[in-house]
Amino acid sequence: MADEAVQEEGIEEEAPAGETKEQKRKRMKQTVLNRLAGARVDTVRDRVVWIMNREITTRDSDITLMLRYWELFEPELYARGNITPDSLYQLTRLTVISRHRATIQNDYKLFLASEEVQAKRGRLDGEHRERRVAENPHMSSIVVYADESGKTADNLLVGTFWILEDIQTLRLKQDIDAWRVATGFKHELHFTNASQGNLHRYLEILDLLVARGNSISFKVITVPRRGNANAPAVLDDLLFHVINRGIQHEHQSGRAPLPRSLQVWKDAEEEARDRVSVANLRERLEAASAAGFDRQLHVQSVTAVDSSKNDFIQIADLFLGSVNRFLHNNRAAGDHAKDQLARAFLAAFCGDGGIHRIENDMVTFERL
């Protein structure tokens, strides 16, 4: 049976000693968000979360949620609605899907149903009402993964990896997972770890990205660190500017025209700083939507997540490392594996001129 073949919950991490019920709820909620950020769909819960995140109508109807689950994750059984009696016994049951939906909405307060449906379910909570005014059930999404660098270097940089259609997060994650299985490569993807011994693996990841080139982009912004004493605050400002200008670029180029919803996933730093920076970034992006985009940009979420299990933030790290190498190491002209990776990465997405002479709309580079 499908709901037995796929784990319902996954292996739960060990609870800290003396953990309270509320602390467990917060920890489990963050685990759900971390797995969503990495497009991990190994369990029934992962899959329910992934669908509810991208399709608003599934938050109100368990039947709609179940049908989308079958269509996306069990297509060989669902067969476009031509369900046989044998298949019906194997498809993930409505009760299983509904139980996960209820936990996600009621316990974690994520992807809440409309107020009308919450009222019918007896779960309407004014303190946790979701901002739904600007949401459109059929609105496309832009997903941005962000990394930062330069706190001890000459320049502060923020690099971002953009997926212009949220369904492509699942497709690319499937590509990467299949590559990991085929190659046995289980390590994190970090530019600093590139060596002659593993360079070919990094170049294989680059090939996967090139194959998805019509649905992704990269954007970076930099400013000298000298004169900017509060580096964390400057990096927060840079993240806002690279996203705000990136939205303008994608809209004007026609690659991702508005209206769109926006999800931002940034590499987690210190918890206290993250809470403030995430809240500030969301408010600034919402203000930018009203002032510059005629409210055609709906800021769905801004979340700090652990990058150690997130391939997409690690891809942002590869891009940022390549740019850094190009800018500060003689345009990556050496023979070191990092030079070769930087040249290959920038040539693939910028053209032969590197970051200084970008030949397409897939990369933007700005200095402040």
What are these regions (language model features)?
Residues 2-143, 148-368:
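Phosphate-ester processing/binding pockets and catalytic centers
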